[in-house]
Structure formats: C-alpha cells, structure tokens
Regions:
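S-adenosyl-L-methionine-dependent methyltransferase catalytic core, i.e., the SAM/SAH-binding region
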Residues: 1-307
Length: 307
C-alpha cells in the first residue's frame, strides 16, 4: 500500500526545532517521512536519524530520504540511547516526536487500527507481540475495565468489558467490526445516537495497551532529553489528552527550579531548571491546515529547550 502522509504542524515544528544546518537531529517517529524529509533538507554538514518501529514505515522513509543526510533505523523511540550509542552519537541538537497513528496504519485495514473497515483485530505498530485480539480474548473484566477507563477515558468501561467477556464465551472476538459492534451494543441507545463513533475511545485504549504507548512515551522522553545538547530543542505532537498531560507534566518538571515536595514550605533542594518552555501553551493547527488535513484537528505541539 502507498504510504500517504501529510505532516502535521510542519512549519511550526521546523520553527520549534530552530535547525542548525550542521546539527544532529532525531525524528523518533518517521512514519511517512514528512517531517524527516523537511528536516533533512535543511541540513548541510548535519545529520538526521529517523526511527520507527513499523517495518512498513522504515522502508518508506528510507526510500523518501534517499540522497539526503539521513539514516533510518527500525526502533521504538524509547530505544534512543541504544541507537545513538550504536551510531556513536553522544548528543543531538534537536528531536521531534509525532505521536499520532500514521495515515498508512489507519488506511490499511489489515493492520486492524480502524473501526470503519472489517479486518483482523491486530493494532500492533511493530507487527510483533500480542495482538489486540489476544488482549480482548484473555484479560479479565477488571483489567479490561482498567484499560478502557485509563487509556480511553471511556465512561462505559465496565459495561463494555462485561459485554466482551460474555461475548467471547460463545465466540472469539477476532475482527475490528465485531469488536466495534460489541462496544456500541454495551452503550445506552441515547449515547449511541449522539456519539458518531462510539468505538473510538475503546479502540484508542486497546491500541495504547497493545503497543505500551504511555510507557514508551515516558521512557522515550527521558532517553531523548538525556541526549539533548545544551540549547537543543525537543518538539512533541500529541493527539489525545492522556499524551498531552504526560508531555505537559514532564516538560514543566524539567523547566521548574525547585523539586522539593509541594507540601514542604521552604525550598531546600537548591534546584536549577534543566530546560525552558518555548511554548507555554500548546500550538494547534490554523484554519488553513484544518481544512487541508483533518488529522491535524486534535494535534497539539509543545516545544522545550534544554539549558
């Protein structure tokens, strides 16, 4: 399948990175190489390292970055330290993470990310490890509820989990539309009528669980920040409130001076900030981009500079 990709908040990311043509940069989520290509085009003696755990994305990015000062590596961005060590790169001058599911993964029904087309219930970005079907057919009601509530902020998590457990006693839940119909059937009729995509939150939750996305984000942010050179910029695009909250909290913690417990009345840590916030509030797409690229609707960009 053709790997189509319109990079989200592209000009804002390029501005946020403040690219040095001689610098070393990391794109931790290569996808269709939309951001990577524009970063690499701005380098002269510099170098770009693009990572992606999806083998389809790696092949596409490698082809699209051919002839540019860029190298593509199949890895999750949580593995940044290992990759940079293997490439003998001690520090980088900037990094970008675009945390959205790529258009290719959504458009390729066989990957099992979409609730609009019937396909095997997969959702693995790396195409390795347990699938979404493995999770929904084996986890108990309590754990399913936790996943749907914590990762999807789904108000009907307990009811949906109950429907899943009951349904799989008769037949395994193996396809995306089978799962989507089951989710909708657990909701009150009024909720189904007002909610255009009743399966959206649950699909998000299961996808996050299958891919360990929030753990990867936490580990990846720490790994990348530790390799940023002073003055290096870190840009992260999020697409839902869970990710944005994590990024916001992490950035603020790096930018704050005092790290004493909030209940302690007097500072004793003598702490100095490790970074400064370039964006106090997240940057969102303007009207023109929203019209051109629907995927940008929920995108939020935060930018940090290491001190």
């Amino acid at each position: 399948m053709e790997f189509s990709h319109i990079p989200v908040l592209l000009s804002q990311c390029l501005d946020g990175l403040a690219i040095d043509p001689a610098g070393v940069y990391l794109d931790g989520t290569a996808g269709g190489a939309g951001h990577s290509k524009e970063i690499a085009k701005r380098l002269t003696t510099g170098r770009l390292i693009s990572l992606d755990q999806d083998p389809d994305a790696v092949a596409t990015a490698a082809a699209r970055l051919k002839g540019l000062p860029a190298q593509v590596v199949q890895a999750n961005f949580r593995e940044t330290a290992r990759v940079l060590d293997e490439l003998e790169i001690p520090f980088i001058n900037g990094a970008l993470l675009d945390l959205g599911v790529s258009s290719h993964q959504l458009d390729d029904a066989e990957r099992g990310f979409s609730y609009h087309a019937d396909a095997p219930l997969d959702m693995r970005m790396s195409q390795q490890g347990p699938t979404a079907a493995d999770l929904v057919n084996t986890l108990d009601r309590e754990e399913l509820t936790r996943i749907l509530r914590d990762y999807g902020e789904e108000p009907y998590a307990w009811q949906i989990a109950g429907k899943i457990v009951k349904a799989r006693e008769e037949t395994p839940i193996l396809t995306t539309l089978q799962f989507a119909d089951l989710i909708a059937s657990a909701m009150p009729p009024a909720e189904r009528r007002k909610n255009k995509n009743p399966a959206r939150r649950s699909f998000q939750a299961v996808r996050i669980a299958v891919n360990g996305e929030l753990d990867a984000l936490n580990e990846g942010m720490e790994a990348i920040f530790s390799r940023l050179a002073p003055g290096g910029r870190f840009c992260i695009i999020t697409f839902h409130s869970l990710e944005d909250r994590l990024v916001k909290q992490k950035f603020r913690r790096w930018a704050q001076r005092c790290t004493c417990p909030p209940e302690q009345p007097i500072c004793t840590c003598g702490g100095m900030p490790k970074a400064k916030l370039i964006t106090r509030k997240p940057i969102e797409a303007d009207a023109g981009e929203l019209e051109e690229n629907r995927r940008s609707r929920s995108a939020k960009l935060r930018v940090l500079e290491k001190l």
